[in-house]
């Protein structure tokens, strides 16, 4: 499995010979160090606990040449470490996509530096800092991708793969920080339309984040569709509302959906998952975006898949941008 990370590696930064990286090389995560590197590492997971840094050019070329139609970037949430959580969840997503259509999608995790000690509250604050610091690193990643695409996706040899993003929980803070850094440092005129769908699941950002003038304002211009999955009984969101840097209590996007739908762009959709989120992730109801305990695709995954397949958001009535997601939706959409 290909992946990208800005976690500190035990082997240190990528060694260079002149301006050329000395890759491939075997690497491993330094899990005791949650500093956010300002460099990103393009890697492959060979098996559990075995990773190879292959470098940006090889990574992007391999991704382009894969016999897949679309790319699914997965940005994980708070307090997730690579092997206990991130890679198994990415493998689950890959398996569910393969069940829908073998060979259609490749899942690529983007791994930022979560903390692994000191208790949940300190971990939460540390992870907030790491997400903000990671924004610059992943903004540089975006620029590298645009530069690579300019020289390697030509009329003679185009890269036609659509790109989708799923950000879960605090991963949405990484997304917000990344896009804000892209505009601040690289593209002052705004984000280009690069992504097919951006799925924001249990988003741990304020519920005004997507409005003009807010820190997440650059997310919706970057995608054809932005889908916000939220649940009022997501217990992690209730705790997050008060456990934030600066002691500012604010309702979360993953708890209520957008505060003012009329203020966000018309490509933003809010999906109420309150009917089933605790069925998939009891009792907290926070990690409900993939499958059930039997390995079947869940409602959110089925909805994401329909959006990926069609490029459109199924809704009833057609003009509605706020949707109650339940089994009735699934039956009516078939």
Language-model regions: role of each:
Residues 1-50, 65, 79-80, 91, ...:
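Lipolytic serine-hydrolase domain surface
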Residues 84-94:
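"Short basic amphipathic alpha-helical interaction patches in structured regions
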Residues 76, 168, 286:
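Histidine-centered divalent metal-coordination motifs
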Residues 69-77:
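Short beta-strand element of the alpha/beta-hydrolase
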Residues 58-67:
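Short beta-strand-to-loop junctions in surface cap/lid or active-site-entrance loops
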Residues 138, 167, 171, 175:
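Gly/Ala-rich beta-loop-alpha elbow adjacent to hydrolase catalytic centers
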Residues 77-82, 172:
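Gly/Ser/Thr-rich loops at beta-strand to alpha-helix junctions
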Residues 164, 168-169, 199:
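Residue in the alpha/beta-hydrolase core beta-strand immediately N-terminal to the catalytic nucleophile
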């Amino acid at each position: 499995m290909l992946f990208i990370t800005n976690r500190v590696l035990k082997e240190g930064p990528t060694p260079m010979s002149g301006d050329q990286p000395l890759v491939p090389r075997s690497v491993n995560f330094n899990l005791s160090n949650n500093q956010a590197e300002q460099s990103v590492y393009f890697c492959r997971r060979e098996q559990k606990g075995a990773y190879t840094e292959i470098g940006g050019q090889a990574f992007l070329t391999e991704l382009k040449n894969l016999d897949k139609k679309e790319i699914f970037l997965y940005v994980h949430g708070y307090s997730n470490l690579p092997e206990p959580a991130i890679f198994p969840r990415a493998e689950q997503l890959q398996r569910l996509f393969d069940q829908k259509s073998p060979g259609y999608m490749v899942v690529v995790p983007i791994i930022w530096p979560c903390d692994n000690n000191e208790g949940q509250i300190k971990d939460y604050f540390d992870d907030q800092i790491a997400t903000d610091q990671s924004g610059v690193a992943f903004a540089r990643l975006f620029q590298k991708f645009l530069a690579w695409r300019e020289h390697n996706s030509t009329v003679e040899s185009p890269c036609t793969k659509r790109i989708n993003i799923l950000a879960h929980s605090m991963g949405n803070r990484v997304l917000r920080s990344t896009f804000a850094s892209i505009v601040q440092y690289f593209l002052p005129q705004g984000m280009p339309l690069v992504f097919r769908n951006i799925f924001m699941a249990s988003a741990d950002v304020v519920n005004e984040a997507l409005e003009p003038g807010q820190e997440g304002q650059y997310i919706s211009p970057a995608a054809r569709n932005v889908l916000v999955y939220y649940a009022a009984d997501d217990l992690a969101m209730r705790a997050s509302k008060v456990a934030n840097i600066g002691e500012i209590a604010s309702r979360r996007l993953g708890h209520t959906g957008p505060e003012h739908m009329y203020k966000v762009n018309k490509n933003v959709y809010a999906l109420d998952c309150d009917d089933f989120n605790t069925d998939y992730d009891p009792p907290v109801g926070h990690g409900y975006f993939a499958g059930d305990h039997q390995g079947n695709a869940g409602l959110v995954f089925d909805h994401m898949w329909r959006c990926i397949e069609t490029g459109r958001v199924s809704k009833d009535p057609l003009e509605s941008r706020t949707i109650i997601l339940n089994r009735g939706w699934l039956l009516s959409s078939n």
